[in-house]
């Protein structure tokens, strides 16, 4: 997307997100109500909160898997994804083993994604590559390799960040590189540190096709 989206166009690309450890059932119900009001694409919640979000109704539900470290055993990630889908989620955002990517073990990264892909057949699968870490501790080829592994494993999206790592969240450089590597075959979700309308528009113009936002209302209100 190039140029300035309308409020409705931007909202339709947003996963309205709440992943804090202290999140309550009431918080998730309020998140879903706000999501329906704002007209976003989906909400993104922890696996244990999927039933609450589904019961609240009126919006698609995405769940994270292996979040936020990505260090879970692949079979655990697969089980977590399957449980979320059985509870009514339609999309899975999984975290790869970042350490495996950094040391060049792309086969391990690919097989990890394949395990979740098999458990999430028919669902949209987004693969979180923690782009700020991969770009900050190595060079561009590590991020490129991780994105290619996601594509080879059958993912639908690559996603920049958990939003939890001190290295940072989405950047224009990372989104551009990810889009150049796998777009338009895969979508690119920018997430982490997108706090203003200008941030959101910059990510879309860099090639993002979905946005993960926690402060969605403020971002939408900031559109001129």
Swiss-Prot record:
Gene Ontology terms: biological process: 2-deoxyribose 1-phosphate catabolic process; carbohydrate catabolic process; deoxyribonucleotide catabolic process
Further facts: Was identified as a high-confidence drug target.
UniProt pathway: Carbohydrate degradation; 2-deoxy-D-ribose 1-phosphate degradation; D-glyceraldehyde 3-phosphate and acetaldehyde from 2-deoxy-alpha-D-ribose 1-phosphate: step 2/2
InterPro entries given in the database record: Aldolase_TIM (IPR013785), DeoC (IPR011343), DeoC/FbaB/LacD_aldolase (IPR002915), DeoC_typeI (IPR028581)
Protein name: Deoxyribose-phosphate aldolase
Lineage top rank: taxon: Bacteria
Primary location: cytoplasm
One Pfam match: DeoC
Organism of this sequence: Mycobacterium tuberculosis (strain ATCC 25618 / H37Rv)
GO cellular component: cytoplasm
Keyword annotations: Cytoplasm, Lyase, Schiff base
This protein's record includes keyword Repeat: no
Keyword Lyase: yes
Reaction(s) the record says it catalyses: 2-deoxy-D-ribose 5-phosphate = D-glyceraldehyde 3-phosphate + acetaldehyde
């Amino acid at each position: 997307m190039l140029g300035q989206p309308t409020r409705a166009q931007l909202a339709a690309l947003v996963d309205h997100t709440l992943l804090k450890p202290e999140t309550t059932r009431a918080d998730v119900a309020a998140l879903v109500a706000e999501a329906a009001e704002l007209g976003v694409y989906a909400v993104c919640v922890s696996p244990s909160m999927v039933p609450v979000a589904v019961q609240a109704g009126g919006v698609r539900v995405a769940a994270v898997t292996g979040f936020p470290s990505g260090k879970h055993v692949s079979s655990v990630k697969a089980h977590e994804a399957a449980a979320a889908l059985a509870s009514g989620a339609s999309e899975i955002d999984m975290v790869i083993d970042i350490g495996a990517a950094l040391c060049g073990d792309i086969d391990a990264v690919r097989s990890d994604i394949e395990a979740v892909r098999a458990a999430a057949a028919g669902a949209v699968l987004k693969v979180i590559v923690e782009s700020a870490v991969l770009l900050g501790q190595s060079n561009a080829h590590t991020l490129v390799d991780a994105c290619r592994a996601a594509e080879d494993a059958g993912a639908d999206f690559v996603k920049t960040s958990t939003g939890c790592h001190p290295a940072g969240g989405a950047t224009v450089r990372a989104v551009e590189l990810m889009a150049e590597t796998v777009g338009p075959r895969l979508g690119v979700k920018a997430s982490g540190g997108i706090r203003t309308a200008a941030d959101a528009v910059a990510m879309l113009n860099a090639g993002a096709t979905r946005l993960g936002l926690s402060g969605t209302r403020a971002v939408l209100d900031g559109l001129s």
